[in-house]
Amino acid sequence: MGPYSVFTAATILATVAVTCNAALVAQTSKEWSQCSGGEGPIVDVIISGCSAVIHGGHDSPKRLATAFNNRGVVYKFKGEYDRALDDYNQAILLNPSYANAYNNRGVIYRLKGDYDRAIKDYDEAIWLDSSIPAFFYNRAIAYTEKQDYDRAIADFEMVLRFNSKNALALYGRGVVRLKKGDSQTGSADIADAKAINPNVAEEFEHSARR
C-alpha cells in the first residue's frame, strides 16, 4: 500500500498554497507528464513519475488516486500483480468513486483466478459508470472463465449494444455459445467477427490474458 491516507493527502493539500513555489509547480508538472505517459510509454519513466507524485503528496486525493492507478497499470503490464493490486487498493481508498480503478483491480483478481472478487469489482465499476463498454467486456471474460455462460453472453450483448460491429464481443459471444453446445449461432457469431476483423481470434485470446 502507498504511504498516504486520505487524511494525509487532504492535510498536505491544505498547505500547498502556502508552501508551493514556481520550481515546485514545474517539477510537479514534469512528474505528472511522466506519470501520464506524456514523455513516452517507457514503463520505468511512468513508474518514476507516478512515485514522485505519490511521495510528493502535493495533489488532491483524486489526483493521487490517479497516480496510484497509473502506476498500477504499469505494474500489471510488467506482471507484478501484487504491486498493481496494492496500488489499485490505494487508488480506491483515496477515491471511492474511481470506476477505472475498480475495473483495473477486477482485472488483477481475474488474472489471479479470483473470479468472484473480479466480478464484484466490475459490478462496482459498472454501477459507477455504465457508459464504458470495456467494463462489461471484462466482466464477460470473468463470467466465461467461471463458466457462467448465460451471464457472459448477456455482458457480450451489452457491449454489442454500444457497437454492433465490435468483433471481440461477437467472437466472445460465439465462443460461449459453442461452449453451451449452440453450434449454429456460435459459428455464425465467429464468422461475423472474422469478417469484421480477420485477426479477432488472436486478439480475443490476448484480451483474455491481459
Where are these regions (language model features)?
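N-terminal leader/linker segments that initiate helical-solenoid repeat arrays
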Residues: C20-H58
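Terminal, low-structured helical/coil segments at or just beyond the last alpha-helical repeat
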Residues: S29-Q34, L178-K179, S183-R210
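Conserved alpha-helical positions within TPR/SEL1-like repeat arrays
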Residues: S36, T66-K76, N89, N100-R110, ...
